[in-house]
A protein has these predicted regions:
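A short, N-terminal amphipathic alpha-helix
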Residues: 32-51
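Conserved donor-nucleotide/metal-binding helix-loop-beta segment in metal-dependent transferases, i.e.
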Residues: 111-136
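Short, glycine-/small-residue-rich phosphate/pyrophosphate-handling segment
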Residues: 148-169
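Short phosphate-binding loop-to-helix
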Residues: 65-101, 159-162, 190
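Conserved alpha/beta core of the MobA/IspD/sugar-nucleotide pyrophosphorylase nucleotidyltransferase superfamily
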Residues: 165-205
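N-terminal nucleotide-binding beta1-loop-alpha1 segment
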Residues: 1-21
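Short aromatic-hydrophobic micro-motifs that form the base-stacking/packing surface
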Residues: 103-105
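Acidic donor-binding segment of Leloir-type glycosyltransferases
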Residues: 46-73
Length: 205
């Protein structure tokens, strides 16, 4: 199978990136934390074998260009009015460019490591949908064998029901869903502290 993965990331713009961390870290600290998480994700996906990887940014930014060069990863721009539209577009683009199974992954889920992604790749031949549920009720990774616009439209992004609603829609459509182990994302100050503790980061970013 031809597999493809789009890593989604926001441009590191002060005041617009990791806003829930700003109270604890300040604007510059939140941006630095975001960059560290993106680089963690890029390091993990760069270790994958047999899967095309792309970095999909929210907007053009010099740091993104530097990441593209440093990690030898193609750079793309997200398109769409909301997160669902942007994910659907990225999945559709990957599938239309020859991928037999395509993934979209968030950049702030540190436990989506090479082993997890290798597992997801191993399930792609027997699934219509692969999803990595997050502790906050969302998900950090979704993969599809075919475009499924209904999984992304009218979804309450940012709520704790995104995963449950996505799963329900997929099952009602008769899609075969494979669910991975629960993951967590870095969104709040306590998540950042957890990341620092588990991944050996010390002090402020």
């Amino acid at each position: 199978m031809s597999l493809s993965l789009a890593l989604f990331a926001k441009a590191p713009v002060p005041g617009q990136t990791k806003t829930r961390l700003q109270g604890a870290l300040g604007q510059s600290g939140a941006v630095a934390a975001h960059c560290q998480l993106v680089e963690h994700a890029l390091t993990e996906i760069s270790r994958l074998k047999g899967m095309r990887t792309e970095l999909w940014m929210s907007e053009q930014h010099p740091v993104a260009e530097a990441w593209s060069e440093r990690f030898a990863i193609p750079l793309r721009l997200q398109q769409g009015v909301d997160l669902g539209a942007r994910m659907h577009h990225a999945l559709q683009q990957q599938l239309s460019c020859g991928a037999s199974f395509a993934f979209v992954m968030g950049c702030d889920c540190p436990t989506l490591d090479m082993r997890y992604l290798d597992w997801a790749a191993s399930q792609s031949a027997q699934a219509d949908v692969i999803i990595a549920p997050a502790q906050d009720g969302g998900y950090g990774l979704i993969g599809l064998a075919q475009p499924q616009a209904h999984l992304f439209t009218g979804m309450p992004w940012g709520s704790d029901s995104v995963y449950a609603q996505t799963l329900l829609r997929a099952e009602l459509s008769g899609l075969k869903v494979v669910t991975g182990a629960e993951i967590w994302d870095v969104d709040r100050p306590e998540d950042w502290t957890r990341y620092q503790r588990l991944f050996g980061c010390q002090g402020r970013p």
